[in-house]
Each structure stands twice: as structure tokens, then as C-alpha cells.
Amino acid sequence: QTFVTIPGTLRDHPDNLSLAGDGFDTVIKVSCADILTMATR
């Protein structure tokens, strides 16, 4: 549940991703996709 909660929190606070920079934003998006893919398998 921790892995699902963290991306969900980040989605609720887009300002945090913007402050972190586009590079960090991209990493989070990829990580979220990987976690969701693993969760569905």
C-alpha cells in the first residue's frame, strides 16, 4: 500500500513536482507506471 500511497499523494500536489523540476517529474511518472504495472500482474 505504501507504493500506491506515495504516487497518489504526489498527484494530489502537482506544485511539488513542478518545484522539483521536469527531470524529477518524469522519474516519478515512470515510477508510477512501473508500480501500477507490477501491481496489476
UniProtKB/Swiss-Prot annotation:
Main enzyme class: oxidoreductase
Q: What is this protein called?
A: Peroxidase 3
Q: Which residues form a coiled coil?
A: none
EC number(s) of the enzyme? 1.11.1.7
Identify which cofactors the protein needs according to its UniProt entry: heme b; Ca(2+)
Q: Tell me the keywords, alphabetical order.
A: Calcium, Heme, Hydrogen peroxide, Iron, Metal-binding, Oxidoreductase, Peroxidase, Secreted
For this UniProt entry, what is the primary localization, expressed as one broad class? secreted
Q: Which family does it belong to?
A: Belongs to the peroxidase family. Classical plant (class III) peroxidase subfamily.
Q: Which GO terms describe its molecular function?
A: lactoperoxidase activity; metal ion binding
Q: What does the entry comment about cofactor binding?
A: Binds 1 heme b (iron(II)-protoporphyrin IX) group per subunit.
Protein localization: Secreted
Query: Is Plastid set as a keyword in this record?
Result: no
One GO BP annotation of this record: hydrogen peroxide catabolic process
Catalytic reactions of this protein: 2 a phenolic donor + H2O2 = 2 a phenolic radical donor + 2 H2O
User: Which species is this UniProt entry from?
Assistant: Vitis vinifera (Grape)
GO cellular component terms given for this protein: extracellular region
**Record function comment:** Removal of H(2)O(2), oxidation of toxic reductants, biosynthesis and degradation of lignin, suberization, auxin catabolism, response to environmental stresses such as wounding, pathogen attack and oxidative stress. These functions might be dependent on each isozyme/isoform in each plant tissue.
